[in-house]
Design a protein with these regions (language model features):
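N-terminal export signals
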Residues: 10-27
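Periplasmic-binding protein-like
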Residues: 119-124, 184-191, 198-199, 231-264, ...
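Extracellular/periplasmic juxtamembrane helices and adjacent flexible linkers that interface
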Residues: 258-341
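Ligand-binding pocket segment of bilobal, Venus flytrap-like solute-binding proteins
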Residues: 175-242
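Bacterial N-terminal signal peptides that target proteins for export
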Residues: 2-10
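N-terminal segment of the mature folded domain
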Residues: 29-158, 300, 337-338
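Short beta-strand->loop
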Residues: 36-38, 129-131, 149-176, 191-194, ...
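Short helix-loop capping/hinge motifs at secondary-structure junctions, enriched
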Residues: 132-138, 170-178, 257-264
């Protein structure tokens, strides 16, 4: 998929002309940085990396290169654990960074180092449907109708897929007579309508948008808007369900790697820049919900209000509990998703 059309010239002008991004003045570091990120952040970090490098050079006189690696969040976390030399990680959910921290690569207190539990922007899960919504898919209950083909990635490898699953679980619990048994039955029926599980969100978007597979894509809000912008309002509609989930993609410095590579100052400045006005404005342009009130207000009606549950809802109990119960080997997802059954 091609990049979202965002004016980098405007962004860079604002960055260079405005106040310095935090941490730039004092930082001295090596000339390259690797951000290991999840699937649908490609366009955002392409723009952000170029803007950050330009601002860094203007402030320090040093030319640097910020690179990015993208894939399913769980697979990306595993790659870092297995030796991929990330300076920073910007993943889909806190559990994936906790998994890296558990191997000693990131300090246990990583989530307290930056504001908002180290999540500089938020997102949610929406439905992307064919133009005119021919199957009438308006809420989670519609996804289990006979003959509906649902496109979603694999929760074992994709952070977005885990958010998709949990949003559906929360909706089912809140229905009249809702219970955990009924939520499990609901998701079992939903996943019978999923013909194939891609490993990451971008792969699922490609399957739906470019290959014409499925009737509905369960998508990150920004990914749905990217498809809408790139392929035209005459091809797709975006549906906001009655209930979704507050996704808080977190960021962290990979301590062991930056200390070995001498890139800590650069890596810390890079993540701090995500919270600066320019970083927040760029996040909003790419349909990530900014934390900064001014950036959110400037976005106008770009982000519809909807009811959102959080991962700390008693239904989930935080990421450690949710991961163990739903997504670890032998968890509920393994019972729910049984291809060919």
């Amino acid at each position: 998929m091609t990049r979202l059309a965002v004016s980098r010239r405007v962004l860079l002008g604002a960055a260079i002309g405005g106040a310095a991004w935090p941490g730039l003045a004092a930082a001295q570091a090596a000339s390259q940085l690797l951000n290991v990120s999840y699937d649908p952040t490609r366009e955002f970090y392409r723009e952000f990396n170029a803007a950050f490098a330009e601002r860094w050079r203007a402030q320090t006189g040093q030319s640097i290169r910020a690179n990015a690696s993208h894939g399913g969040s769980g697979r990306q976390a595993r790659a870092v654990i297995d030796g991929l030399q990330a300076d920073v990680v910007t993943l889909a959910l806190a559990y994936d960074i906790d998994a890296i921290a558990a191997r000693g690569l990131i300090a246990p207190d990583w989530q307290s180092r930056l504001p908002q539990n180290s999540a500089p922007y938020t997102s949610t899960i929406v439905f992307l449907v064919r133009k005119g919504n021919p199957k009438g898919l308006r809420d989670w209950g519609d996804l289990v109708k006979p003959g509906i083909a649902v496109v979603t990635p694999n929760p074992k490898t994709s952070g977005g897929a885990r958010w998709n699953y949990l949003a559906g679980w929360a909706w089912a619990l809140r229905q009249p007579g809702g219970s955990e048994a009924r939520a499990q039955d609901y998701l079992t029926t939903l996943f019978r309508n999923v013909p194939v599980l891609d490993t990451g969100a971008r792969g699922s978007t490609t399957s739906f948008v470019q290959r014409g597979q499925g009737d509905v894509l369960l998508a990150w809000e920004n990914e749905a808007h990217l498809a809408f912008a790139e392929f035209g309002a005459d091809k797709f509609d975006i549906v906001y369900p009655s209930l979704s989930i507050l996704a808080e993609p977190p960021v962290a410095v990979v301590d062991r790697n930056v200390d070995r590579r001498g890139t800590r100052a650069l890596a810390e400045a890079y993540l701090q820049a995500l919270y600066a006005p320019e970083g927040q404005a760029l996040a909003a342009r790419h349909y990530y919900r900014p934390r900064d009130a001014a950036a959110l207000a400037a976005a106008g009606d770009r982000f519809p209000r909807l009811e959102l549950v959080t991962i700390d809802d008693p239904a989930f109990g935080g990421w450690q509990r949710a991961q163990a119960r739903h997504f670890d080997d032998g968890g509920l997802f393994d019972r729910i998703y049984q291809p060919g059954r």
